[in-house]
């Protein structure tokens, strides 16, 4: 089985990364990247300090502590919205053959498995 690893920092399929520019709208706010939205919202409350940082593709600012009861579902929602509102990116994702496994090898936390799972589920359902 062939793998498609996603990691912005090494430019491995960076267009699918949570740090890639895919501007989207969620709950009254516009976000530059999925990471922008996630860091702003992961605590369960809107974090204005994080939202108004100088976000750009590849940039990451750490927001408040994540609510571990909701953070994975939040990431699922944000990734889905970002692709649905950026159809070119969605088409690129769905063009990846189903036999190709999406990976996120450099990550050492929950996103090593959760991030590829979310993308693979979105790819399969779109």
Question: Where do the protein language model's features map onto the residues?
Answer:
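Charged, low-complexity intrinsically disordered segments
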Residues: 1-126
């Amino acid at each position: 089985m062939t793998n498609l690893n996603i990691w912005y920092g090494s430019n491995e399929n960076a267009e699918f990364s949570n740090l890639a520019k895919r501007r989207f709208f969620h709950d009254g706010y516009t976000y530059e990247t999925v990471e922008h939205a996630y860091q702003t919202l992961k605590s369960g409350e809107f974090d204005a300090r994080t939202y108004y940082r100088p976000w750009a593709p590849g940039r990451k600012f750490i927001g408040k502590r994540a609510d571990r009861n909701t953070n994975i579902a939040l990431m699922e929602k944000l990734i889905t919205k970002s692709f649905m509102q950026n159809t070119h990116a969605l088409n690129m994702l769905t063009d990846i053959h189903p036999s190709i496994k999406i990976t996120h090898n450099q990550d050492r936390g929950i996103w090593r498995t959760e991030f590829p799972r979310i993308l693979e589920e979105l790819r399969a359902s779109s």
